[in-house]
């Protein structure tokens, strides 16, 4: 009998009434590769007072309204006075800050994401914290941004919830 990882996981989940909810890959910076990448827009470092009014849908990967108290530092890309990209980091634990990134759709494919991600990683390291980057396994564009920004795969994670909750979430999608 062929006992693949997926088959073993499925049996274990069925027996426990739990199911996989989310699978993600986490990245750490490669200090031999990490460098501030350029882009054609002005980059500005932002502290909590600067981004207090930015908890909007377009910045939901960079900032988390439900966990505002963890959002520590951001780097924004500006086209004149218009914010066109935002990378934010949250203090998910004492020593590690997680980076999230958003760019307005009409400004994508201009190197903004990698410029913001790399700059925020450098700023995080300068504060004595370890930056990390996380994305869903299916988010290939985000994983490519991590690699381009100087990060390398470090670990994977899986969130497990009661099967009825996962079924309900899947019905909504």
What does each of the following model-derived ranges do?
Residues 133-147, 152, 159-165:
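Conserved beta-strand-loop-alpha-helix junction that forms the acyl-donor binding cleft
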Residues 86, 154-156:
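Residue-level detector of high-confidence beta-strand sites
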Residues 109-123, 144, 148:
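Conserved acetyl-CoA-binding loop-helix of GNAT-fold acetyltransferases
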Residues 169-170:
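C-terminal helical cap(s) of enzyme catalytic domains, especially alpha/beta-barrels
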Residues 1-51:
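Acyl-donor-binding surface of acyltransferase catalytic domains
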Residues 64-96, 100-104:
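A conserved beta-strand-loop-helix scaffold within acyl/acetyltransferase catalytic domains
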Residues 124-136:
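Conserved GNAT acetyl-CoA-binding A-motif
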Residues 42-69:
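Internal catalytic-core helix/loop-beta-alpha segment
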């Amino acid at each position: 009998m062929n006992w693949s990882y997926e088959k073993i996981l499925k049996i274990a989940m069925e027996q426990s009434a739990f199911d996989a909810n989310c699978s993600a890959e986490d990245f750490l910076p490669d200090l031999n590769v990490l460098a501030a990448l350029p882009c054609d827009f002005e980059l500005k470092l932002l502290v909590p007072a600067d981004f207090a009014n930015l908890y909007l849908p377009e910045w939901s990967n960079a900032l988390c309204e439900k966990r505002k108290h963890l959002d520590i530092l951001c780097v924004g890309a500006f086209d004149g006075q218009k914010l066109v990209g935002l990378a934010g980091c949250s203090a998910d634990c004492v020593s590690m800050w997680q980076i999230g990134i958003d760019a307005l759709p009409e400004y994508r494919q201009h190197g903004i994401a990698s410029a913001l991600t790399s700059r925020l990683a450098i700023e995080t390291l300068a504060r004595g914290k370890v930056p990390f980057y996380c994305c869903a396994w299916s988010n290939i564009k985000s994983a490519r941004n991590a690699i381009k920004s100087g990060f390398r795969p470090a670990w994977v994670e899986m969130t497990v919830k009661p099967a009825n909750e996962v079924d309900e979430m899947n019905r909504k999608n």
